[in-house]
Structures are given as C-alpha cells and as structure tokens.
C-alpha cells in the first residue's frame, strides 16, 4: 500500500512514530476545524485542508492504538484512549497495565488497556480442550506456524526454550494471543481475571466465527453482564 502512494517508511522506530504523530496531528485538526488551514511540517506540506463531514457527534472518536515497543507505548500514552498489548500471563500483564497507565499520567492523560484472545468455548471443559488440541496440535501446520513467527521476527534464539514453545503453540492456536479455552463459566472466570489485572477489555477471535460466536454470545455474554463486566447491548430503535 505504501508503494502505491510512493511513500517510503524509515526503518527507524523513532522516525516512523514521529511521522505518525504529525499525521495524527493533521487528522485531529481536520476533525476539529471548521475552516481551511495550511500545514508546513517536517513530513507534510499541505494547502487549503478541510474535511467534511466531521466525526459523528462533533467529537474526536475514541482512538485505539497497538504498540509493544517503547516508542509505540509512548505514542499511545500521548494520543490514544486505549492501547492494545499482548498478554503473556496475568502477572506480567498486570504489571504492564500499571506501567502503561503511569506512562499516560506523565502526559496528564488517562488510558485504558486492551489485550486480544482466541476463544474455544464448548459446553464442557473437556470438549473445549479436546477440540483445542485437535486443531492446534494434532492438525497444526507447523511449517506455516514457523514461517509466520519468522516473518514477525520471533526466532528460537530470541527466547528461552520454554517461552518459545509457549509462543509457538499459541501461534498455532490463535496467532500468538492469549488462550481462552473452556466452558462458559471458565471463560468468564478468565475474563474476570483480565479485569482484576487492570485490563479494560479484550478482543476475541474464533476458529469459525459463524459456528462458534452464537454460542459465545448466548452463553458467555449474559454471564459477563450478570457479573457487571459488560453493559447489556440494547439494539437502537429502527
């Protein structure tokens, strides 16, 4: 996509985030300004800039940004309402959430933290674990898993053996994110632990959304609502 527009991105994290900061400053100006403006910056030179329609409600929409590097987390702390971060385990996750929130306070801001998870939810714990083992172990495409990890810079030499095995198994099961595997009550218990660790929420993925999400919707979401971890969804009047 960058090549289509003849945009060359630096290999430097600092430069890329500096570029991103200026781009975002322009976007915020477009969203909030009712008049044309010019922009002369380090990366952009623009004339007669104006955007319409504005974001719904006349306010800047909630901003979510993923970042695990120091530069990425600084960018989110300064600009985003929510930061996505990878969860390895809940103990280190809680410490990471605390550090991110403290970082945002340094900029006079508050920020929520999200993670992402893959879900295997079945009526019983045994059913969930058996299916998880079936697709993520017995039928896993290990050469493809190793290639995917390689493309993301994750190599056996980069981690202790136990950590590499953990990541490899999670990539086979759900692109490396945190596992939620079990019956509905177990899934809710795990999500409660997310909340207690300071997370504002998590995205969820499934092997097959069409087949699996209805069960998650009907069995897990009401339990989350009953525990006060999720607001009840009310469909707007047509």
Each predicted region: which residue ranges?
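Structural motif
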Residues: 78-79, 197
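Glycine-rich, proline-tolerant flexible connector loops at the mouths of alpha/beta enzymes
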Residues: 87-92, 204-217
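An alpha-helical appendage that flanks or caps ligand/catalytic pockets
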Residues: 9, 13-57, 87-196, 225-238
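Acidic/polar active-site rim loop that often engages polyanionic ligands
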Residues: 1-10
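Hydrophobic faces of well-ordered beta-strands that scaffold small-molecule active sites
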Residues: 62-66, 81-86, 111-118, 202-205
């Amino acid at each position: 996509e960058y090549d289509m527009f003849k945009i060359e991105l630096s290999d430097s994290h600092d430069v890329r985030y500096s570029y991103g900061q200026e781009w975002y400053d322009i976007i915020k100006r477009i969203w909030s300004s009712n008049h044309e403006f010019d922009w002369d910056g380090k990366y952009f030179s623009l004339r007669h800039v104006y955007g319409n329609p504005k974001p719904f409600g006349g306010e800047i929409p909630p901003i979510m940004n993923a970042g695990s590097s120091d530069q990425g987390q600084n960018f989110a702390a300064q600009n985003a309402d929510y930061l996505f971060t990878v969860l390895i385990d809940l103990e280190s996750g809680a410490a990471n959430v605390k550090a991110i929130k403290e970082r945002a306070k340094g900029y006079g801001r508050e920020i929520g933290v999200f993670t992402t998870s893959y879900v295997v939810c079945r009526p019983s714990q045994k059913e969930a674990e058996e299916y998880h083992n079936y697709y993520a172990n017995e039928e896993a495409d290990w050469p493809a898993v190793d290639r995917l990890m390689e493309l993301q810079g994750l190599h056996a030499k980069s981690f202790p053996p136990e950590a590499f095995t953990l990541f490899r198994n999670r990539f086979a099961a759900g692109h490396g994110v945190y596992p939620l595997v079990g019956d509905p009550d177990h899934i809710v218990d795990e999500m409660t632990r997310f909340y207690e660790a300071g997370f504002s929420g998590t995205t969820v993925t499934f092997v097959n959304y069409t087949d699996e999400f209805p069960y998650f919707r009907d069995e897990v979401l009401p339990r989350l609502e009953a525990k006060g971890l999720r607001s009840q969804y009310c469909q707007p009047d047509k």
